[in-house]
Amino acid sequence: MGPGKADLLDAVARSGSIRAAAEELEMSYMRAWTLIRTMNAAFRSPLVEKERGGSSQGGAQLTAQGRKVLELYRRMETKAGRAIAADWERVKKELR
């Protein structure tokens, strides 16, 4: 799990579609679907459920597990950002 996969989960949650999420993130549908399959296989239960196409065009949604993992990941990102903020300011002072 990393920022790209988290962004993909966010985009699926917003759009209700793997294809729309892929377009939003400027990646191919195949790449998005591969990342989702990888995440679904890595966790105890799937993070994304895909609905069949047809007249309703299908779609996708995050499962409860997907929402939980995404929330935990975003919380970790926030904590990490706060933890390094002071050091990052010191690094920026060294830039030209």
Q: Over which residues does each language-model region extend?
A:
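Short alpha-helical "packing" element that flanks the helix-turn-helix/winged-helix DNA-binding module
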Residues: 8-9
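Short helix-boundary/capping micro-motifs
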Residues: 12-23
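Central "turn" residue of the DNA-binding helix-turn-helix
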Residues: 26-28
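Residues within the DNA-recognition helix of helix-turn-helix
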Residues: 35
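Residue cluster at the C-terminal edge of the helix-turn-helix DNA-binding motif
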Residues: 41-46
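Basic, amphipathic "hinge/linker" alpha-helix immediately C-terminal to the N-terminal HTH DNA-binding motif
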Residues: 50-75
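Alpha-helical linker/hinge and terminal dimerization helices associated
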Residues: 69-91
